[in-house]
A protein has these predicted regions:
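Short helix-loop capping/hinge segments that flank enzyme active sites or metal/cofactor-binding pockets
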Residues: 2, 76-99, 277-295, 344-446, ...
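Short glycine/serine-rich loop/turn segments
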Residues: 42, 73-219, 249-254, 286-288, ...
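Sec-exported extracytoplasmic/periplasmic mature domains
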Residues: 19-20, 33-45, 61-68, 117-118, ...
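Gly/Ser-rich, acidic/histidine-flanked active-site/gating loops
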Residues: 7, 87, 93, 248-378, ...
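An extended, acidic, His-containing surface patch that forms the Zn2+-binding/catalytic region
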Residues: 421-443, 451-496
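Short, well-ordered beta-strand elements
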Residues: 223, 504, 514-523, 531
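An N-terminal boundary/leader segment
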Residues: 1-59, 65-69, 91, 309-322, ...
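A short helix-breaking turn/cap at a secondary-structure junction
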Residues: 72, 200-308, 541-577, 585, ...
């Protein structure tokens, strides 16, 4: 039997360990939770997973029982994952990072969560984000996530990287994959800064039902994985037709016909051939992203170490049989009118002049209100009942954002909702606007691809990475808000026009040790071809680097042991308690564990193993920690995190049970 190393383990690695008896799902959940306790809640305090699923061990134990009985639900049964705080998971809060919704409880699972639950995957917890995903690295009700690569730099783009917790958690091996989202670049930016794979699908490619909306025309589900094969395994589960449309804008609106998910996907994503996919492909790299743009009003300043990585990537692509050509990029130039002669969608009459205002106000207000009404939490039944001042408050000392004309107070949504929410069909300019977005994509991107004989475009995902103190330091903010750094390259264009992208690791910058991604973008609804060419590059280059700040813990390696010869069927009962007593500069944690059967016991406090004294089926012990352990700051709206105590017990007949508790602070 081979040993299983948790850090960087793939879905296939974990599944193999589950199948051959090296590990159980309960033990996987315990190990990931210990990493969260050690690196996320305490220690370097990455703060990526602020909400834990209290039922994680029960879900894992149910998976282990199915496996013993030969009734597994599929390839992801027992596999732990995280989801962004904007995904509904029944019974958990769905705050979307906002103090206004800190106690909003999800009445059902989002589509993707439901698909994963039905496949047996185990939700560890919900990941951090700024309020309502309306930004990137602004601090929300749970604070923000930090970088596992370099504490001095941001884990996502400051202005658009709201899936920052998902990026950090997946990179740091707090789970094997994460579910993020994107409206501008909130999935791509954290993927780039964390050496991850991210997929932003064509419109309707993955149902977004049950996800908090931001701007419905742009919002998409974005899976985060460490490899393309992991992404493909995940897509096999979450890409499916959704019979319900409410809450998934592009399938609700009646004016633009989009394909069903089943029409876009292959029989098996995991079986897609990747090797050789780049051979013979002609790829365009926009000059604006590789330091060769001339004539732009606001040129992109790309860091020298990013350009070094790009030059290597270009050589790699050519070695894999692709032709790489430098091109102008009218789809971005026209959209942003960034140079003389560029003409926007409105300039050309493709989109009504009032569409932008109707989209950001009427449409978003309608979608937020509809989300709350569908969720049916009596405490917050609709948008008009929300405390608007709490939606996106500024923490003390934070610099003002620099969105310019796009900046406004989200509290105004509530005030407008109190005057009445217009039904979707009654919002002026929406039909013409949606059709105009589709026409713009065809004219400025797909027709342009055809005219230049291009199969796709490829580009560095970002021009630079912002400093970690960009929220409080003016000089750092100047860099973090610079074009190419404030939002991942492409800015709003990909999502607004419905252009699919796949981002994979391009390498790690030699000067600052931060990763950078390589983004591939292609024709709408040609997602499978895009996945294969990105997968071919990732397969051949393996440019992902392991975060140096989150190494393996002592118990992150599971030794091959084979399946137990006899496995009991009865539930393995255990009761875990912990109490904290303050004594000057230290806190004493008293732990008690009772098991219903004789068992081997492993207990950890904040990821560190502790010894307990046993008497029959009762085990007790005490741990001393610095009082500062329970005084850490992560949010002005919450108290300090407590210590996480985990217990894994294994009975002589092979049954494994787990439990956790939190003491000395919030959970």
């Amino acid at each position: 039997m081979l040993n299983l190393h948790l850090v960087e383990a793939s879905i296939a690695n974990l599944r193999r360990g589950l199948e051959d008896g090296t590990v159980t799902s309960v033990e996987l959940v315990g190990a990931y939770l210990n990493r969260i306790a050690h690196f996320d809640r305490h220690g370097i305090a990455l703060n990526a997973v602020p909400i834990l699923n209290p039922n994680m061990f029960e879900e894992a134990e149910a998976s282990d029982r199915r496996r013993r009985e030969g009734k597994t639900l599929g390839s992801l049964d027992g596999i732990p994952y995280t989801a962004k705080d904007s995904y509904k998971a029944k019974g958990l809060t769905v705050a979307a990072g906002s103090p206004a919704f800190q106690h909003l409880t999800a009445n059902e699972d989002a589509f993707t969560i439901a698909r994963l639950r039905a496949a047996g995957a185990v939700l560890i917890g919900l990941t951090n984000m700024p309020p309502m995903a309306n930004g990137g690295m602004q601090r929300g009700v749970y604070g923000r996530a930090e970088s596992p690569y370099n504490k001095d730099f941001l884990t996502a783009a400051f202005a658009s990287g709201s899936s920052n917790g998902s990026g950090t958690a997946t990179a740091a091996s707090f789970a094997v994959f994460g579910l993020g989202e994107e409206t501008w670049s909130s999935g791509r930016a954290p993927a780039s800064n964390n050496a991850l794979v991210a997929y932003t699908p064509s419109r309707g490619g993955i149902s977004a039902r049950g996800n908090w909306p931001l701007v419905p025309t742009m919002d998409v589900v974005v899976p985060h994985t460490r490899t393309v094969p992991d992404l493909l395994e995940l897509l096999d589960v979450i890409v499916a037709d959704d019979a319900e449309t409410r809450g998934d804008f592009w399938r609700v609106q009646p004016w633009v016909q989009i394909p069903k998910a089943s029409a876009l996907r292959p029989a098996s994503y995991a079986a897609l051939p990747l090797q050789g996919a780049l051979k013979g492909k002609r790829l365009g790299v926009p000059k604006m992203y590789v330091g060769k743009d001339e004539g732009a009003d606001r040129p992109i300043e790309t860091r020298a170490s990013v350009l070094d990585l790009w030059r290597q990537a270009a050589r790699d692509l050519e070695a894999l049989g692709a032709e790489v050509v430098e091109v102008d990029f009218p789809v971005v130039s026209n959209y942003e009118r960034d140079r003389p002669g560029a003409r926007t969608m409105v300039d050309r009459g493709l989109v009504p002049a009032e569409f932008a205002e109707r989209e950001i106000w009427d449409l978003s207000i309608w979608s937020w209100d509809d989300f709350l009404r569908a969720n049916a939490d009596p405490a917050i039944p609709d948008l008009a009942s929300v405390d608007g001042a709490k939606i996106f408050p500024q923490p003390p000392g934070a610099l003002r954002d620099r969105y310019g004309d796009a900046d406004f107070d989200l509290a105004q949504y509530v005030e407008r909702a109190k005057q009445g929410v217009a039904p979707l069909a009654d919002i002026p300019a929406i039909e013409a606007g949606l059709k105009g977005l589709e026409a713009t994509r065809r004219i400025d991107f797909e027709d342009w691809l055809d005219a230049n004989r291009l199969d796709a475009v490829v580009l560095p995902a970002v021009a630079d990475v912002g400093p970690a103190d960009a929220d409080v330091d003016e000089a750092s903010a100047m860099l973090a808000w610079r074009n190419g750094t404030w939002v991942a390259n492409g800015n709003l264009v990909w999502r607004h026009l419905g252009i699919p992208t796949v981002t994979v690791p391009m390498g790690t910058m030699a000067d600052i040790g931060m990763p950078v991604g390589l983004t591939f973008a292609g024709r709408a609804y040609d997602d499978v071809a895009l996945l294969t060419i990105a997968g071919d590059y990732e397969r051949a280059t393996r440019r992902r680097t392991v975060p140096p700040r989150t190494p393996a813990l002592a118990d992150d390696v599971f030794e091959g042991r084979g399946a137990a010869s006899r496995v009991g069927d009865a539930h393995l009962t255990l009761a875990l308690t912990a109490e904290t007593t303050r004594s000057g500069a230290t806190d004493e944690i008293a732990i008690a564990l009772e098991t219903g059967d004789a068992a081997v016991v492993k207990v950890h406090v904040n990821g560190e193993p502790v010894s307990l004294q046993g008497s029959g089926n009762r085990f007790t012990g005490r741990v001393i920690v610095p009082a500062t352990t329970h005084q850490g700051f992560h949010s002005v709206w919450r108290g300090s995190y407590g210590s996480i105590v985990t217990a894994i017990v294994r009975s002589p007949d092979g049954r494994v049970g787990g439990a956790y508790t939190v003491t000395g602070g919030i959970g």
